[in-house]
Amino acid sequence: MHARFAAAFSQLPAELQAALTPVMASDTFNAVITAAQVDAIGHACHLDRQALSFALLPLAAAYALTPISHFQVGAIVHGASGNLYFGANMEFSGTPLQQTIHAEQCAITHAWLRGETALASITVNCTPCGHCRQFMNELNSGTSLPIHLPGRHTATLGDYLPDAFGPRDLQIKTLLLDPTHHGLMLDNAASDPLQQAALDAANASHAPYSQAYSGVAVETPRAVYAGRYAENAAFNPSLPPLQAALILPNMSGDNVNAIRRAALVESRQAPLSQYAATRATLQALGCNDLQHHPL
């Protein structure tokens, strides 16, 4: 089991520790607890799904990277599949605060990148900030998404974000988490797994306002990870593709400071580009090898 969990794990009831150990001690654990595992753990510990999620929040918060705030936030997304996806806030030294990934963004994007196409609810250890409320309003669940907080009655996103402005006000039909494919093509991408991963991510990205479809793939000594752009009706809460890509190595127990090379695929004709911000953030993380493929 990864050392990051030691303190939080030691505080769990012994029965829950015993049920979780086979799952979390696995070398393949990637911050996802499958529906079958949720049922088995809940049965062994006499916990329903929501009680289990509350108990797991400290483990989700253990994924936080907080060199600036030193304040850990954990979130757990309940996918429509029954899986639970961990998320935590991620900050990056040497970059503007705007490059921060909030815990709710992390958990939701984590679920999206793992193939989830709808959410049942989200559980967070702190009240969602306005930025995250607006980010969640881009989801295909809309304002009906249930939000669970310790010590509070369950409320919906609509309760936290009344009179919301979102994609439906702009007649956007394809929403965040809806499957899509933009038809971008890159010659010889199949010869390089990094390029292919970035291309696949760009084709699945959500950018209905700018059509700036984009994806980033990063390579560490362990694996290639890819992330997609998640645009927002309010613009500023949009999550850049690099940030999405950085979620996966962190959730997989890898090191975001161990990136050897990266690739950005994006629409050439779009009114904006991810290149400058992607390059600057990668350089802050110690990576200077960025391939750029405008299509």
From Swiss-Prot:
Residues binding substrate, per UniProt: 89-91
Stored Gene3D superfamilies: Cytidine Deaminase, domain 2
InterPro entries tied to this protein: APOBEC/CMP_deaminase_Zn-bd, CMP_dCMP_dom, Cyd/dCyd_deaminase_Zn-bd, Cyt/Deoxycyt_deaminase, Cyt_deam_dimer, Cytidine_deaminase-like, Cytidine_deaminase_bacteria
E.C. numbers: 3.5.4.5
Note accompanying the cofactor annotation: Binds 1 zinc ion.
Sorted UniProt keywords: Hydrolase, Metal-binding, Zinc
Binding positions (Zn(2+)): 102, 129, 132
CMP/dCMP-type deaminase domain residues: 48-168, 189-295
One GO CC term on file: cytosol
Keyword Zinc: yes
PROSITE patterns assigned: CYT_DCMP_DEAMINASES_1 (PS00903), CYT_DCMP_DEAMINASES_2 (PS51747)
Reactions listed under catalytic activity: cytidine + H2O + H(+) = uridine + NH4(+); 2'-deoxycytidine + H2O + H(+) = 2'-deoxyuridine + NH4(+)
Active site residues of this protein: 104 (proton donor)
Molecular functions per Gene Ontology: cytidine deaminase activity; identical protein binding; zinc ion binding
Family, as annotated: Belongs to the cytidine and deoxycytidylate deaminase family.
Alphabetized HAMAP family for the sequence: Cyt_deam (MF_01558)
Function: This enzyme scavenges exogenous and endogenous cytidine and 2'-deoxycytidine for UMP synthesis.
Quaternary structure, from the entry: Homodimer.
Protein name per UniProt: Cytidine deaminase
